[in-house]
Amino acid sequence: MKPLNIIFAGTPDFAARHLQALLNSHHNVIGVYTQPDRPAGRGKKLTASPVKELAVGNNIPVYQPGSLRKEPAQQELAALNADIMVVVAYGLILPKVVLNTPRLGCINVHGSILPRWRGAAPIQRALWAGDKETGVTVMQMDVGLDTGDMLLKTTLPIEDSDTSASLYEKLAEQGPVALLQALEGLANGTLAAEKQDEALANYAEKLSKEEARLDWNKSAQQLWQEVRAFNPWPVSYFEHQGNTIKVWQTQVSETTSTAAPGTIISASKKGIEVATADGVLTLLNMQLPGKKPLNVADILNARGEWFSPNTRLANEAQ
């Protein structure tokens, strides 16, 4: 297969993994687009994206326009004369003129099995909804949000032990493999594009810190899914004794209870059992303010009086 001249567009670590795969391949990365440097850390120092750092380290020209809607930026991109543009978590909208500039157009690697979970947080929403599988879709981009024709799909079972952090790692390994397969198929003309079924489409809304508050009026199953979805960010939490307590790990208990949602049923080194609207949730790993995450046994050693049976935990619905 003849090497393709590729423009890569991406910003976070997830994107950098894909850029690295392209750099390791026989293709030519002729330019990299990434978002402008942003203030980060306590000193708010301007910081380059992981994609920029990787590109600079490999002596690849880097472009950081604030927008691709203006003609000078579009002309600059066209002058690269690329065969294809690969887009992974770039964060900027590509207007139609840009989508049509490379010879083979623009393709995107998306962290879900489209058309399910279009949008910003597909990995987290798959866990949040209790999906049994996820995967990666490589699509030909159009002007819609993750609406383009699908070129290649891979699947991955979601394990009970998975969190957003672990799924992210799995998809960050799966995505680059799918990307290289798709590029080979495009170059050889052997890929058949598949339209997305709009009837099956839904959107993965961005996560918010407010959404991470545990609502004991939900079922234990739903709360278990949310804790996994919101790990490592924004991290599920509840308010108790005037403190915000983060929850990193839970499981659905086999215990049954008729107690009001938010009531502590039992507290031992095996876990703190809390009644919900449907079932009992066992808290296994938590984080007190200013402390690191700890197993419940250590939490009870430090603050056992906070979690006595029959204590009612704060609930936003109270």
UniProtKB/Swiss-Prot annotation:
Catalysed reaction equations from the record: L-methionyl-tRNA(fMet) + (6R)-10-formyltetrahydrofolate = N-formyl-L-methionyl-tRNA(fMet) + (6S)-5,6,7,8-tetrahydrofolate + H(+)
Enzyme nomenclature, EC number: 2.1.2.9
InterPro entries in the record: Fmt (IPR005794), Formyl_trans_C (IPR005793), Formyl_trans_C_sf (IPR037022), Formyl_transf_N (IPR002376), Formyl_transf_N_sf (IPR036477), Formyl_transferase-like_C_sf (IPR011034), GART_AS (IPR001555), Met-tRNA-FMT_C (IPR044135)
GO molecular function, one term: methionyl-tRNA formyltransferase activity
Keyword match Chloroplast: no
Gene3D superfamilies, per the entry: Formyl transferase, C-terminal domain, Formyl transferase, N-terminal domain
Enzyme class: transferase
Keywords associated with the record: Protein biosynthesis, Transferase
GO CC annotations, alphabetized: cytosol
Binding of (6S)-5,6,7,8-tetrahydrofolate, residues: S112, I113, L114, P115
Listed SUPFAM superfamilies: FMT C-terminal domain-like, Formyltransferase
Protein family membership: Belongs to the Fmt family.
Stated role: Attaches a formyl group to the free amino group of methionyl-tRNA(fMet). The formyl group appears to play a dual role in the initiator identity of N-formylmethionyl-tRNA by promoting its recognition by IF2 and preventing the misappropriation of this tRNA by the elongation apparatus.
Stated name of the protein: Methionyl-tRNA formyltransferase
Gene field: fmt
